[in-house]
């Protein structure tokens, strides 16, 4: 059980849910520039396993690292933190 707690957990926004049982999540983080010290925002996309197809585009979700589920999937959906407002 202690090994499970060391897995990476990210919070990000769903940018694609077109695939069956798979979502694409963009995670934005800040990194300090080594020379100038300014914080620079950068983003990275992860594909995550969504067993019940519950996450939709625009939702804020929490994903956790897991064993490789396919050629590109290394994360699974933990929970939908905030649902998107559809206008």
Swiss-Prot record:
The protein's assembly and partners: Part of the 30S ribosomal subunit.
Gene name for this UniProt entry: rpsQ
UniProt-recorded Gene Ontology molecular function terms: rRNA binding; structural constituent of ribosome
Lineage: Bacteria, Bacillati, Bacillota, Bacilli, Bacillales
Recorded family membership: Belongs to the universal ribosomal protein uS17 family.
Pfam families in the cross-refs: Ribosomal_S17
One CC-aspect GO term: cytosolic small ribosomal subunit
InterPro entries in UniProt: NA-bd_OB-fold, Ribosomal_uS17, Ribosomal_uS17_bact/chlr, Ribosomal_uS17_CS
Record function comment: One of the primary rRNA binding proteins, it binds specifically to the 5'-end of 16S ribosomal RNA.
Any one of the GO BP annotations: translation
CDD domains listed in its UniProt record: Ribosomal_uS17
UniProt protein name: Small ribosomal subunit protein uS17
Keyword terms: Ribonucleoprotein, Ribosomal protein, RNA-binding, rRNA-binding
Entry-linked Gene3D superfamilies: Nucleic acid-binding proteins
